[in-house]
A protein has these predicted regions:
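ATP/NTP-dependent adenylation/nucleotidyl-transfer catalytic domains that generate, transfer
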Residues: 1-31, 36-273
Length: 273
C-alpha cells in the first residue's frame, strides 16, 4: 500500500470512529515527536483545525527543541494549543510515596509515573470538554511493549496503531510533500523527522537505545515474519539478520501481548502483505 493510501486510511478510520461514538472534537498530547505530530495532522484532516486541541505536557526531562517543535506544529496546523507542565503533579506523587514508603521513585517507576501524569491531565480535559482523546502509539512500540499501561497506551482510538514506526515517518513525509505541492505550509517541522525519537522520561533517553534495536531493523523483521508470514529462518536469510537475535526479539514481542490487549482500537486495514 502506498504512503498516501496508508495515510488516508488512517484519517478515514479516525473520523469514522469518532462519529460512531458521538464525538466531533478531539484532544491530543503534543510531544514534538513524529507520532504525535502525524496524529495531529491526521486529526486536522479528519475534523478541521478548530476541532483539534493540542496539549503540550513538558516534564522534568523534556527538551527545549521538542517543545519548540510541538509549538511550531500547532502553529502550522492552526490548532489551539496549551501547555500544562507535569512537573508539579509528578513531584507530588514522589512526595506522597516517599512519605509512606521512605523511597524515591526511580527508573521505570519514575518514567511510567510521568507518562501517567500526562494521561491524567489529558483525560481530565477530555472529560471536562467532551473531547475524544486520540492515542498516538504505533505498531512497533506496541510490539516491543515500549509504552506505559494507563499512560501513553490510553485513548479512544489509535490512528497509527496499524503502522510501524518507519511508516509513520513515511506517511508524515508524504503529507508534507502534499502540502508543499499545494503551496501550503508543511505542517510537520523538519526537525521532527531528523532528531532521534525519544520518550524524554529520563536524561539523554533514546528509544532505540532503550529497546536495544533500531526501528528500521525491527520493522523489517516484524513485517517479514508477522505480516508476510515468512519463517524466522527465511526472514533472517533474506534480510541478513542474526537468527538468535531475531528469535529473542520475537520472544519479547510475544511476552508483551498482555500490553497489546489493553491498547485502544486502530484502523482495521491490511497495510502489509
Amino acid at each position: 500500500m502506498k504512503a498516501g493510501d496508508k495515510y488516508q486510511a488512517c484519517v478515514d478510520a479516525l473520523a469514522a470512529y469518532a462519529k460512531g461514538i458521538g464525538f466531533s472534537q478531539v484532544v491530543i498530547g503534543l510531544s514534538g515527536g513524529i507520532d504525535s505530530s502525524v496524529t495531529a495532522v491526521m486529526a486536522v484532516d479528519a475534523f478541521g483545525a478548530k476541532n483539534v486541541h493540542g496539549v503540550l505536557l513538558p516534564g522534568p526531562y523534556s527538551t527545549g527543541h521538542s517543545i519548540d517543535d510541538a509549538l511550531a506544529l500547532a502553529e502550522n496546523l492552526g490548532i489551539e494549543s496549551h501547555t500544562v507542565s507535569i512537573c508539579e503533579p509528578f513531584e507530588a506523587f514522589e512526595q506522597v510515596i516517599r512519605k509512606s514508603y521512605k523511597e524515591k521513585l526511580e527508573g521505570l517507576a519514575s518514567e511510567n509515573t510521568q507518562a501517567r501524569c500526562r494521561m491524567v491531565i489529558l483525560m481530565a480535559l477530555s472529560n471536562a470538554n467532551r473531547w475524544m482523546l486520540v492515542n498516538t502509539g504505533n505498531k512497533s512500540e506496541a510490539a516491543m511493549g515500549y509504552s506505559t499501561l494507563y499512560g501513553d497506551t490510553a485513548g479512544a482510538f489509535a490512528p497509527l496503531g496499524g503502522l510501524y514506526k518507519t511508516d509513520v515517518y513515511e506517511v508524515g513525509r508524504w503529507r508534507n510533500e502534499q502540502a508543499r505541492a499545494a503551496g501550503d505550509v508543511e505542517p510537520i517541522p523538519e526537525n521532527v523527522f531528523v532528531k532521534p525519537p525519544s520518550a524524554e522520561l529520563a536524561p539523554g533517553q533514546k528509544d532505540e537505545a532503550s529497546m536495544g534495536i533500531d526501528y528500521e531493523t525491527l520493522d523489517k523483521l516484524l513485517i517479514a515474519v508477522q505480516e508476510q508470514g515468512q519463517s524466522v529462518e527465511d526472514a533472517c536469510d533474506a534480510l541478513g539478520f542474526d537468527i538468535m537475535q531475531a528469535t529473542g526479539l520475537l520472544a519479547r514481542v510475544d511476552s508483551y501481548a498482555f500490553k497489546r490487549a489493553q491498547e485502544p482500537p486502530f484502523p482495521d486495514v491490511k497495510f502489509y502483505g
